Amino acid sequence: MAGKKGQKKSGLGNHGKNSDMDVEDRLQAVVLTDSYETRFMPLTAVKPRCLLPLANVPLIEYTLEFLAKAGVHEVFLICSSHANQINDYIENSKWNLPWSPFKITTIMSPEARCTGDVMRDLDNRGIITGDFILVSGDVLTNIDFSKMLEFHKKMHLQDKDHISTMCLSKASTYPKTRTIEPAAFVLDKSTSRCIYYQDLPLPSSREKTSIQIDPELLDNVDEFVIRNDLIDCRIDICTSHVPLIFQENFDYQSLRTDFVKGVISSDILGKHIYAYLTDEYAVRVESWQTYDTISQDFLGRWCYPLVLDSNIQDDQTYSYESRHIYKEKDVVLAQSCKIGKCTAIGSGTKIGEGTKIENSVIGRNCQIGENIRIKNSFIWDDCIIGNNSIIDHSLIASNATLGSNVRLNDGCIIGFNVKIDDNMDLDRNTKISASPLKNAGSRMYDNESNEQFDQDLDDQTLAVSIVGDKGVGYIYESEVSDDEDSSTEACKEINTLSNQLDELYLSDDSISSATKKTKKRRTMSVNSIYTDREEIDSEFEDEDFEKEGIATVERAMENNHDLDTALLELNTLRMSMNVTYHEVRIATITALLRRVYHFIATQTLGPKDAVVKVFNQWGLLFKRQAFDEEEYIDLMNIIMEKIVEQSFDKPDLILFSALVSLYDNDIIEEDVIYKWWDNVSTDPRYDEVKKLTVKWVEWLQNADEESSSEEE
């Protein structure tokens, strides 16, 4: 995480007004300015999502307005991508003035790759003094926060294990704003305590799913409800324990999928999370789909009293007209142009003769030509639109230029500073940026400076067909569709622990908390020698035993047999087929990992919890399958190999959790782990799976050295 030098103070706010207030009574807020997603690419390659305008107002302004009305005393803006832009914006905003309702501080955290990283950074900094609001920088809401805070305090008094309250709005009230991250919440009907959480597939996928709840979670619950009609607006009230829990569980990345699901299903933590349900308007701008819908809602005054003509920015001059039309001062409209319902136009914009605009937002200082049709679209500041163009359900970012007779079909995104030549017709869902995005699967379409790119004839022809002879732009091709992309998927594909361990700052406390076992003092022989396990030629491997052995272990787990029965069946099978314990270990590990994979795939448990559940119960089988140091080393090699073969999303977390379980249960000794690690395979295909284990082994070795020093 970023060190102290990454923290910049952006003004005193009302610091003097609250200087005498008890530190614990000061309501703090943490704003996540980065979503750690790619849904708003290619625009977010240039500007952070929180500074993108919605109805000509930067998204962050809506979040800060909410916090001001909520009575927050101190705000921390966590900035990852484009951190300097955000800091500069805040320093020049009203929130940095002496009469600001709160003190605001920007915290540079460029290494953060998910919400979990941010929470661990907060814990390291020690700046959270009590309960705090955790909110995304893309929230739009008119909720009465005092009621949510009252509910939070009430639950905290009634339940000493209460650590967090989620705000969930009812989607039936605002059906079009339903999230593209659907989820099921199982709630205690009488208290709204969250009993279980599960991500759901998108409705468009038509994938069938079911909710599988551990019956133990329903203990002491008289009646529960299953809700999949709730909008998760990512407004949470957290106690100071929340960052610490993220610190102790450094595999937690997502706020819901990892933290909420992990906490409420953990017997060890024993903490509770509650849901505050509201009928008020509370949504996140989490995708292009919700950007479109929320913009129309806002123009339609669904978020009253937060409306465009309230002019929340000091330089705004919007006035409200009938049919939800908003205009700033100094707008020039030709006599024959027609402005339809739900339309906003910024100051300095000129609209030509015969142009028709409906259900759209036009920014400031735009030049809209003659006989243009703009419907259900968004045109940001300083754009130029040539005559006779048609723009349908598209977005044009600031400083873009469209020539005459240009047609943008449904879903087009034109990036900052892009130029489209005359007479161009862009296909649906075309996304264009002004510069190449090499890491995003984009191809170059710039006819003014293409010398550094080696393009074939087809690409050159296609470039002309997209932006025209005088156009400037690069096609952006997302590897994941907007609807499929999510914070969870982004963390999996780009920024997970398994892919970016070198960017994850792990503390010794994080690793030590994962290893609950008290350290044992042992000495490691300096002359011990590791011998590779005897290789068995594939022609002599008994495939029939592996198949039968796996089935035997799976049957034992499915029917919850006791260990002695499972061992007896395996041993009988081993002797009847005349195979070695090496084959028995392979079959057992394969079956256990399949069980782990099943729990993860069905979303019954997270990766770490699934491994702990399976290996804590069935790992004792290995005590009767390995009898010396060499065989335990063989066991660890098999585990690593089979995890790679199984293609887990987080292979390093699976291996780490499995080894910790075996170590905690006294199945594998510490000195054996050291010898295995000193001689572990250097094959590149194992590099990813070993990334977490290296940290754990280092921690074990450091703890050994500290123990030796204490004895001396």
UniProtKB/Swiss-Prot annotation:
Present with 33800 molecules/cell in log phase SD medium. Residues 1-20 are annotated as: Disordered. It is found in: Cytoplasm, Cytosol. Belongs to the eIF-2B gamma/epsilon subunits family. Pfam families: LbH_EIF2B, NTP_transferase, W2. One of its GO terms (molecular function) is translation initiation factor activity. Coiled coil: none annotated. Keywords: Cytoplasm, Initiation factor, Phosphoprotein, Protein biosynthesis, Translation regulation. One of its GO terms (cellular component) is cytosol. InterPro entries: ARM-type_fold, eIF-2B_epsilon_N, eIF2B_epsilon, NTP_transferase_dom, Nucleotide-diphossugar_trans, Trimer_LpxA-like_sf, W2_domain, W2_eIF2B_epsilon. Transmembrane segments: none annotated. This is Translation initiation factor eIF2B subunit epsilon. The modification Phosphoserine is found at S478, S481, S507, S525, S538, S707. It comes from the Eukaryota. GO terms for biological process: cytoplasmic translational initiation; regulation of translational initiation. Component of the translation initiation factor 2B (eIF2B) complex which is a heterodecamer of two sets of five different subunits: alpha, beta, gamma, delta and epsilon. Subunits alpha, beta and delta comprise a regulatory subcomplex and subunits epsilon and gamma comprise a catalytic subcomplex. Within the complex, the hexameric regulatory complex resides at the center, with the two heterodimeric catalytic subcomplexes bound on opposite sides. It comes from Saccharomyces cerevisiae (strain ATCC 204508 / S288c). Residues 539-710 form the W2 domain. Signal peptide: none annotated. Acts as a catalytic component of the translation initiation factor 2B (eIF2B) complex, which catalyzes the exchange of GDP for GTP on eukaryotic initiation factor 2 (eIF2) and is regulated by phosphorylated eIF2. Its guanine nucleotide exchange factor activity is repressed when bound to eIF2 complex phosphorylated on the alpha subunit, thereby limiting the amount of methionyl-initiator methionine tRNA available to the ribosome and consequently global translation is repressed.
